[in-house]
Design a protein with these regions (language model features):
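Sec-dependent signal peptide recognition
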Residues: 1-8
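Catalytic cores of secreted/periplasmic lytic hydrolases that degrade extracellular macromolecules
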Residues: 8, 16-59, 63-182
């Protein structure tokens, strides 16, 4: 409960935030700060039981976009590898599969990519088990980030995805990137 109040107060102090604004970064720490700010601001408007842990949001953005350096992140503000199957919508085709029946979604800003990712985890049937576990952790106010990463097995075809995500989250937390200390 206290964590939720603190997150809400932090957001209120950053009231000039706008999802239409983009963030810039020159290194991993700046990238994490940008993603974190987008996530905190959006999470503040969600019921506390629906707030995706920041470690997972930042960890997946870092893993999926190579710390914001991937072609899809640079050209399409797509930090999570989100696909677009309606090819009349803005998208970028994967270079290795130009004939694919999908592209990767293009977003006006990186923050809107973060919002879409959060909404996907909160609504898509593939992540029902993730949501159920997250809710149970919310009830007792004790989150096991690494157990939650196991529930994201549908996010990638890579059978080692959860292991890679855990390593990325450990890298981020051990360096204090989420706390603003390096």
């Amino acid at each position: 409960m206290i964590k939720n109040i603190c997150a809400g107060l932090l957001i209120l102090c950053q009231s000039s935030f706008n999802f239409q604004d983009d963030f810039e970064y020159n290194n991993n720490e700046e990238f994490i700060k940008g993603v974190k700010n987008c996530a905190l601001f959006y999470n503040a408007d969600l019921p506390s039981k629906d707030r995706i842990p920041i470690e997972i949001i930042v960890g997946q953005a870092s893993l999926e976009s190579d710390w914001g350096r991937s072609r899809f992140a640079l050209e399409g503000n797509n930090l999570y590898g989100m696909r677009e199957y309606d090819l009349t919508e803005p998208h970028i085709k994967p270079l290795e599969n130009l004939e694919a029946n999908f592209g990767l979604k293009v977003y006006p800003t990186k923050c809107l990519s973060v919002v879409h990712y959060i909404e996907t985890l909160l609504s898509h049937r593939s992540y029902a088990e993730f949501r159920e576990n997250m809710y149970n952790m919310w009830v007792v106010d004790e989150y096991d980030i690494f157990l939650l990463t196991e529930m994201l097995y549908n996010y990638s075809a890579d059978k080692d995805y959860a292991v890679k995500l855990r390593r990325t989250i450990l890298y981020i937390t051990e360096r204090g990137y989420l706390n603003g200390r390096k």
